[in-house]
């Protein structure tokens, strides 16, 4: 991720088409490829591509749902000619800032952590990862007939948080706070 302690340069290889866009003093290199090919890279980059088939299938559905939800939101905002998205809130006592897909408008998603980790075909896609994508092609998570914003964390530390406490104040009834541990284990969050 950009400006994270694990930021590093890496040589990567991509498939698909390359589109260059000049915006002010920057040149953006955009990789254009089919959704399912993108997902093969994501599930091989976000987690171990040698994980069990069922875990890879679950991740495929989650990542596909998140991606299609973001594209749908982006298209709606373009159709409404709306630039009303702010990735921060400010009160007299605090400023809360989060990084989101809306922080870029020239392309659907990026390879940074606020979107999904995408590293092209550099990491190699295992037969199980390819099988997971193929067996779940087109499958998404729905809530009230809408594609879910299926955000996830690679490492939750034993607890998840409600959507509105991490991103914009727009609660999602399917993204709730849960403990992710053995039954009966107490988690000490006093030093968090």
Annotate each predicted stretch with a short phrase.
Residues 1-192:
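Conserved, single-site charged/polar hotspot
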């Amino acid at each position: 991720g950009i400006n994270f302690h694990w930021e590093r340069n890496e040589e990567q290889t991509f498939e698909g088409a390359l589109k260059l866009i000049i915006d002010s003093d920057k040149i953006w290199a955009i990789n254009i490829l089919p959704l399912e090919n993108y997902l093969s890279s994501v599930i091989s980059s976000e987690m171990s591509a040698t994980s069990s088939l069922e875990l890879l299938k679950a991740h495929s559905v989650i990542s596909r749902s998140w991606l299609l939800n973001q594209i749908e939101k982006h298209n709606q905002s373009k159709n409404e000619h709306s630039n009303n998205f702010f990735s921060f809130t400010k009160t007299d006592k605090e400023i809360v800032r989060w990084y989101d897909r809306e922080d870029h408008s020239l392309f659907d998603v990026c390879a940074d952590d606020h979107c999904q980790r995408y590293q092209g075909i550099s990491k190699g896609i295992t037969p199980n990862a390819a099988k997971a994508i193929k067996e779940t092609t087109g499958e998404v998570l729905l809530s009230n007939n809408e594609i879910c914003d299926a955000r996830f964390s690679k490492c939750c530390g034993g607890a998840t948080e409600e959507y509105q406490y991490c991103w914009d104040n727009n609660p999602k009834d399917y993204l709730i706070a849960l403990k992710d541990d053995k039954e009966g284990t107490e988690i000490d969050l006093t030093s968090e």
